[in-house]
Amino acid sequence: MPPSGKIEVAEEGNRRKGEMTPSEMRQCATDIVAWFTQHADLDAKGCDQSVIDELSKKRDVPLALEELWREAATDVWFEGYQLLHPQSIGKMLSDIDAPYVPFARDIDDALLVVGDDAVYEYEMGDGRGDRLSSSIADYLEAYRNKLLEGRFEYMDGDGCVETMASAPSRGK
């Protein structure tokens, strides 16, 4: 019998349907911090809940970000962006347009912010830039997966850089 021309793609693995649950967000934060503990000698110290609550009074803080801060308040890197302590964020909010909450900064003071649950790049003089992810939970999960797949290595003071083995082929 000739093929029908119909192609079916088999999806492997255990894909989640819908948003992350609170326990999945907690596990994601734990996995990210564990990676930095192992690869960057991170001495993880979570943030006191009262500090997170104080920030939450000023801006809407997504649960996925709260879970990360409960595990580690600083020294986690998102490639070249370092996680900001919630206390320092509270002091920055007067310079950042609402509803955005900065959560990481690079060496040039560019920020990663979350607003309306999406993740964006943010420049202090220019405001919101490119959208990086539709939600902070998706952003953290994708980053965690890349860390655990061995696609990044930690470079002291520079953050995480993509490993050569995972870099796209440049051709001949």
Where are these regions (language model features)?
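Generic structural signal for residues positioned in beta-strands
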Residues: 102, 118-120, 138
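Short, surface-exposed beta-strand/loop "edge" segments at domain boundaries and coil↔beta transitions
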Residues: 109-113, 120, 126-133, 161-162
